[in-house]
Structure formats: C-alpha cells, structure tokens
Amino acid sequence: EVRVENFRATVPSSKSKLEFTGVGEGGISTCDLILDLRGGTPLFSAHEKRDGYFRPDPANPGAVAEALFTLSDMTGEFEKPRYVDYDAGICAHSSSRITGCTKCLDVCPTGAIEPNGDKVKYDPYICAGCGLCAVVCPTGAAKYSLPAGDSLSDRLRAVLGTYTKAGGETPVLLVHDDTFGRDIIALSARHGRGLPGHVLPFTVNQATQVGLDTVLHALALGAVQVAILLPPSKRADRDTLLAEFEIIDTITDGLGYGKGRVVLIEPDEPDQLEAALYVDALGAMPTGDVVGMGRKRSILRLGLDTLHRNAPIQPEEIALPAGAPFGKVEIDTEGCTLCLACVGACPTGALKDNENMPQLSFAEDSCVQCGLCKNTCPEKVISLEPRLSFRDEARSHQVVKEEEPFLCIRCGKPFATHASLNHLTQKLSGHAMFQGGDRLDRIKMCDDCRVVQMTVNDDNPLAHGTVPIPRTTDDYLREREELRAKAKQDMKDKGITDGEA
C-alpha cells in the first residue's frame, strides 16, 4: 500500500508529455510492483532486497529501460517462500516486558522483524531471505527453511564423505549462492584456471545463511576450511558474518587447529576468486561422521564435541568474545535471596528450581547468554561470562545455592527462605508501620498466621482513633444551662447576690 501526495489523474489526450488534471489530493494505491524514478530517498530500508521494488537511476535511460522490460514480464501469480521458521516457544527476546536478546532485530536489513509482546513477529512479505536472523539466533528459534529439514546437513555429509572416501585430502568447502556464485565459478572454469581440485563447491540459497552450526559441522566432517563466497549485493552484511567467524576462530585456535578455518571471499572478478583459492592448504582436520540432526544447539554441540575429542589441545574451557551464544551465569550467592525470578525468565531452562526445597541450579550447556536472568534479577547479583565449557558437569544442572526453608515462628510451617526474609526484615525495619511491639515478627509468619495475629492483637497499625459522638443543639443548650447553674453556685458561695456589683 503506497500513499501518494498531490495525486492527480492523467489527461488521456496528452501527446508530447504526460499532463495531469484536477486538484492534487492524497491517494492510496495497492500494488505489487513499484517503479521509483524520483531519484531521492528510497521508499524502504534495504530497498535492493525488496521484491517488486525497482529504483533505477532516472538519469540512466538504459537502467530505466531495463527496469521497464523486467516489470512488463512480471505478470500472473507468484509464490513467495517463507524463508524462516520461527518457534516462539524458545525465543529469548523478552520476559515480562524485560528485554533480553535482540540479535535478530539488530541485524535484519529489511525491517521484517518487530517486537510482539515478549516475542517477535516476522513479516514474510517483507523478508528477503538473507538468513542473518537464523545465523545470529542463539536458541535456534529462527531457523532458515531453505532447504527444509536436515537436508543441508545430509548434503554436507554426502559431499565431504564422498570426497574423503575417494582419497581426497584437505577439502575446502566453497559455499556460494545459485546466482552470482554459480556464475563467477562458471566464468573461472571457462576463462581461467577454475577451482582447485580440493575445493568443493556447495550451493545454498543465500551465502549469508551460513552460521556457526553449518561451519562447525563442516569442520567436524573433515573440511580444513569453509570459504563463504559473498556476492556484491550482500557486502553490507559482512560485519554480521565476521562477528560469527570471530567466535569460530577463537574456538578452533583454542583447540589447537589454528585460526582461518572459515574465511570470507568477496570477489568481483574470476581472477580475484582464483587468487583467494589458490593458496597453501591448511593442516588436515580429523574426519568424523557427524549426523547433524535437530535444531541449532544440537548440531553445534555435536560438532564441538567431535572437534574437541580429536583436537591437538583439549582444554576444559575456552574464553569467548562478547555476544557468543555459550557461557556461564555468575551468581553472587551472598546477595542472592533465592527469589527465583531468574528461573521464570530463563527461556532455555538453564536455570532451574526445586519444587521440594529452596534451591537454584544451573546447566551451562543450555545457557545462550541472552541476559534475561541478569536483567530480571531484583538484587542485581547476576553477571554473564561468555565461554565454552567441555566439562561433564556443564551438561547437567549443578546446584548454585540452596537453603533449608524458613519455618513460621507461630505454627512451624515452611513458607520462605532465610535469605529472603532477612533481606525483607532489613528493608522494613525502619518503616513506620513496623515500629513497636511484635509488628516486625509478623514478617516471619506464614500468610495464615499473619492474618490471625493481626486480628487478635489490639496493636493494629491500621486502626484509627475513637469516633466522636455527633453534637446536637440540645447538647449545646444543656451545656449552657449547666454553665449558668455553675456560675450562680459560685456567686452564692462567694456571698455575691445578683444585685451586687
């Protein structure tokens, strides 16, 4: 839907140029195709990614003609694929209006994603299918749906497995799209040296859809390097990919494989592509048969475990850069009151309580470093530490803090924790409603006993004074007569008569 200012109808008899009639008014047009010849600010952000929006340079007749011919061929009905499958159940965007992860909102170039309560909402008609949201999503709530299911992982296993069984060594996986990437590889094969023998082309829908899970899976299958061939139309997205590749470099370097296992190639000509590929191959990687099934976190863990198991160096943990989807939650147990607000906010179940006693436990393998627990904590005792742990205890919940339940001082029923009651008592000790008597002790009673104590105790902080009896005219007249009688009696006692001065 496009709103147009000064909208006027054209004169059918216009000859040398278009003429318009009537008075300019606001108009609304619902259309599938837009040809923008204003030469000014585009109507949309990331306009080059919008389907059906053409914005050629009005000073270039050739570009305008090409756009017109392209538009004239766009007749009939078209199907637009849904590029992203979104699972709101594991989204870490926010909880109780407290914001956590905003990665997909930050990287979407077209504005197809917007907040929707505690979750986000995708507009499939605006989405251009770049896949960046799925790349940065820490939980896998956003999953790229082309290809569907686990077919991408199956293709990786088939390509690298077949190459290895045939005796191939040091395979380099060249990831490219089906347009620019395919064409530049074809030009290199026809007019240049083509691809080196150990470079395996791997076609995907968009080169920008490849993230941590795909790269680590390929390395675990034996690829010595993953090269992403980025077309010119995607150069604006390079920073997002480089941030993800920094995490991979940190992991592979920490395991002894060295850096540079994933690279970004941005050629404009076939010669530049060949120059980037005809280099000395990196050292061999261990070959494993990793079946990439399930969502993102499962594939990541399978790939990481394989790489760690066969690594030259096998550290127990690796420090990661900020923003990594792995890490630990540091909790100051002295300041923690076991209110368990963090448990309710955690979208992945990394933080868990115990229904039988006041207890907080944490599973590092499930943590995505979204920050919801940190932002929700009322005591501000939680901090995040991005790291990758290979310890066995990281895979299960470990107790962070536990206490024996506090018993009601009146009936003995367990109803709270010592830490929370001590904190509450300290906060309310100076409050006027809890001064004197046993008012402060009511905090240490369960809900039932607290009501009973306030009912039977005369020291009620909410009680008001005695209500005065309303006075009437008769009351005032009676008081007047009583005062007169008293005055006469006083005069009589003093020996004063009514006639004396």
Locate each region found by the language model.
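Ferredoxin-type iron-sulfur electron-transfer modules and their immediate structural context
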Residues: 1-107, 111, 170-183, 202, ...
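Short secondary-structure boundary/capping segments
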Residues: 50-53, 188-192, 240-246, 463
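Flanking helices and flexible, charged tails adjoining ferredoxin-like Fe-S electron-transfer domains
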Residues: 66-71, 89, 132-217, 221-222, ...
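Conserved short loop/turn motifs at secondary-structure junctions
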Residues: 90, 121-126, 204, 232-237, ...
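Basic (Lys/Arg-enriched) interaction patch that binds polyanionic ligands
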Residues: 107-140, 341, 345-348, 357-376
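Terminal amphipathic helices with adjacent charged low-complexity linkers/tails
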Residues: 116-157, 235-245, 261-266
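Flexible gly/pro/ser-rich segments immediately N-terminal to CXXCH heme-c attachment motifs
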Residues: 119-130, 331-336, 359-369, 397-398, ...
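Cofactor-cradling patches in redox/metallo enzymes
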Residues: 214-222, 226-264, 269
